[in-house]
UniProtKB/Swiss-Prot annotation:
Coiled coil: none annotated. This is Polyribonucleotide nucleotidyltransferase. GO terms for molecular function: 3'-5'-RNA exonuclease activity; magnesium ion binding; polyribonucleotide nucleotidyltransferase activity; RNA binding. SMART domains: KH, S1. The gene is pnp. Its main location: cytoplasm. It comes from the Bacteria.
Length: 717
């Protein structure tokens, strides 16, 4: 048979059927699994290189997640009808898959591994990211590549006080929590979430619920592997020569590294570490030992020294204890012409954050497989090489920048006012000007301040803190506000953002096999203390949103017109709306329900547009006074343009009090006059009067003048 190695496993999971299949598609890959959940179908493949590239001192794992438009029965929009560079969501999902599987490869494994996940069908109800993570885990487990899995994953919602397993797209929209987690049988490896100010207890409960919920998936992968797994690759054990080299590196470097890590300032510390490393490698080269292997051993020795110092003495690299947050300085309004700005400095980490307010025309149009939609809140995170004192690539954002920006986006998004209350498009740019750990959390703090400086009515400020973990057999330590070195050498990156009322975002990545609920609870409680401290420091700069938007920002006025009048405002081919825009200098957005948003740089501009639109959608009222312009004069009176594009006749008898010999004696073409609508003639034409209006003040003086004005005896009717 052609597909004699085809195997299938299915289970009921979260009210829907999860199906895992292998042996039929992509059979030349080391591992390939087709996973279906509802009508969402993905293909995950895994291929590993059989040899290590010379000089390779890291694990080259690549994860590529791709959404095909045909999966939802669509053709890509735009000029090119083919999927191109990865979208933001594809990049984020690639990272989502990468993060829980990376820690489960053996220490010292250097073979290149590539995971590719393609979305083949999307039912627009079941999100493909969870299915993709499960499929990738299954493909790795079957591949024979050394992998200490399998990994399970789930999405958790929170509606009406109840946790929901794998909520549908419609349920996610009404949920107060959107949490994705992944892990093994023993514990959790990765968490990513957006929440509406939930308590630490609720967040921990969601993680515990999710960990239990994906255990059947792990069991299904194990059962599939019992039938379909390939023979495991042999693991290369450390040779006697490598053990001797590691001992020699320890002998040459330990004391020098201890002294270097006693330096509290980052730049000076790195210079001393670099000097120790150069001396060690020079000695080893003279002894004709492997310098490339020694570099990795040097990193491991660094980790050992830092980790044990923290566990034994409770003292960190920069001299702090495990709970202390670095000194903070928050400033707002630092850039004169921007709509909102903030400079947030925490130790040697600094973010310059700028907020810009725009109109609906500035919204990001996203062409996704579900269809086109618009995004009104944009957050862009930039990490230039100078922020860490290095040279490097400058250009389009990398995966890390996209991921950090989205993390900060999730932290702020639940607090944003609705479009009906604040009809602006918001773009925030975070420029990381210095970095020594927690730059994404500095972005959260800076974004909160910059938005409030711009007048965005956030109900409460938002702050974020990054937590770390050092875990050995002899104990563990949870670290508040970690440095870059503590991130690299530690076992956990645990980021929590929120307000004084609760958590808005939580992201966790574990570099060891898993952590316990006890450690996670300690980290959450410690993070809350740190977050409240940071909020207190931020309040010294700004306690809440400014009363109004910046003078440099557009003023948006919202008016409503009847739906059947929209065509009158737009005009044939957009002729009328273009004329209004040109006349007023405003940006105007018209929605299908008759809502019109007018963005102007001054109140005068906005009023000009409002008056013109009102004139098109409303009827002038008898007895009301209007400002108009004389457009034509005749023997029998003057024609006045008023109420937008309306024209009316001021009969010669209504031009002024007393006798008027000639129309031209009172008005000329182009004069601005104040008129009162006094009725319609038998042909429906508007009749106006100037004589009953005080031309200086615009006041109605009907009761002060006679019923009829003067006129020429030969004036035409």
């Amino acid at each position: 048979m052609m597909f004699d190695k085809y195997f299938r496993k299915e289970l009921d999971w979260g009210g829907r059927k999860l199906i895992l299949e292998t042996g039929k598609v992509a059979r030349q890959a080391d591992g390939a699994v087709v996973a279906s959940y509802g009508d969402t179908v993905v293909l995950a493949t895994v291929v590993g290189a059989r040899s290590v590239k010379p000089g390779q001192d890291f694990f080259p794992l690549t994860v590529n997640y791709q959404e095909k438009f045909y999966a939802a029965g669509r053709i890509p929009g735009g000029f090119f009808k083919r999927e191109g560079r990865p979208t933001e969501r594809e990049t984020l999902t690639s990272r989502l898959i990468d993060r829980p599987i990376r820690p489960l490869f053996p220490h010292g494994f250097r073979n290149e591994v590539q995971v590719i996940v393609n979305v083949l069908s999307h039912d627009l109800e079941n999100e493909p990211d969870i299915v993709s993570l499960v499929a990738a885990s299954a493909a790795l487990t079957l591949s024979g590549i050394p992998f200490f899995g399998p990994v399970g994953a789930a999405r958790i919602g929170y509606i009406d006080g109840e946790y929901i397993l794998n909520p549908t797209s419609a349920q996610i929209a009404e949920s107060r929590l959107d949490l994705v987690l992944a892990g093994t049988e023993e514990g959790v490896l990765m968490v990513e979430s957006e929440a509406h100010e939930l308590s630490e207890e609720t967040m921990l409960g969601a993680v515990t619920f999710g960990h239990a919920a994906f255990q059947p998936v792990i069991q299904a992968i194990i059962e599939l592997a019992e039938h379909a797994a390939k023979d495991p690759w042999p693991l290369v054990e450390e040779s006697d020569e490598e053990k001797a080299l590691a001992a020699r590196v320890d002998e040459l470097a330990r004391e020098g590294l201890r002294a270097a890590y006693a330096e509290r300032e980052k730049t000076a510390r790195h210079e001393k570490i670099g000097a120790v490393k150069a001396a060690v490698l020079e000695t080893l080269a003279a002894e004709e030992r492997s310098v490339e292997k020694a570099k990795g051993m040097f990193k491991e020795l660094e980790a050992d020294i830092v980790r044990n110092a923290i566990l034994d003495n409770g003292i960190r690299i920069d001299g702090r204890d495990t709970r202390t947050v670095r000194p903070i300085l928050a400033e707002v309004g630092v850039l004169p012409r921007t709509h909102g700005s903030a400079l947030f400095t925490r130790g040697e980490t600094q973010a310059l954050v700028v907020a810009t307010l725009g109109t609906a025309q500035d919204e990001q149009i996203v062409d996704a497989i579900e269809g086109e939609y618009r995004e009104r809140f944009l957050l862009h995170y930039n990490f230039p090489p100078f922020s860490v004192g290095e040279t490097g690539r400058v250009g389009s954002p990398g995966r890390r920048e996209v991921g950090h920006g989205k993390l900060a986006w999730r932290a702020i998004h639940p607090l944003l006012p609705g479009k009906d209350k604040f009809p602006y498009t918001l773009r925030v740019v975070s420029e990381i000007t210095e970095s020594n750990g927690s730059s994404s959390m500095a972005t959260v703090c800076g974004t909160s301040l910059a938005l409030m400086d711009a007048g965005v009515p956030l109900p409460r400020p938002v702050a974020g803190i990054a937590m770390g973990l050092i875990k050995e057999d002899k104990g563990f330590a949870v670290l508040s506000d970690i440095l870059g070195d503590e991130d690299h050498l530690g076992d956990m990156d645990f980021k929590v953002a929120g307000t004084e009322a609760g958590v808005t975002s939580l992201q966790m990545d574990i570099k060891i096999t898993s952590i316990t609920p006890e450690i996670m609870k300690i980290a959450l409680d410690q993070a809350k203390d740190g977050r409240l401290h940071i909020l207190g420091e931020m309040s010294k700069a700004l306690t809440g949103a400014r009363e109004g938007v910046s003078a440099n920002a557009p003023r948006i006025t919202v008016i409503n017109v009847p739906k059947d009048k929209i065509r009158d405002v737009i005009g044939t081919g957009g002729k009328v709306i273009r004329e209004i825009v040109e006349y007023s200098g405003c940006k105007i957005d018209i929605e299908d329900d008759g809502t019109i948003k007018i963005a102007a740089t001054s109140d005068e501009q906005a009023q000009k547009a409002i008056d013109r639109i009102r004139s098109l959608t409303s009827e002038p009222e008898v007895g009301q006074i209007y400002t108009g312009k004389v457009v034509k004069i005749a023997d029998f009176g003057a024609f006045v343009n008023f109420f937008g594009a309306r024209d009316g006749l001021v009969h010669i008898s209504e031009l002024a009090q007393g006798r008027v010999a000639r129309t031209g004696d009172v008005v000329k073409v182009g004069d601005t006059v104040k008129v009162k609508m006094i009725g319609l003639d038998d042909r429906g034409k508007v009749k106006l009067s100037m004589r009953v209006v005080d031309q200086a003040t615009g006041a109605d003086i009907s009761d002060q003048v006679g019923a009829k004005g003067g006129r020429r005896e030969d004036a035409a009717e």
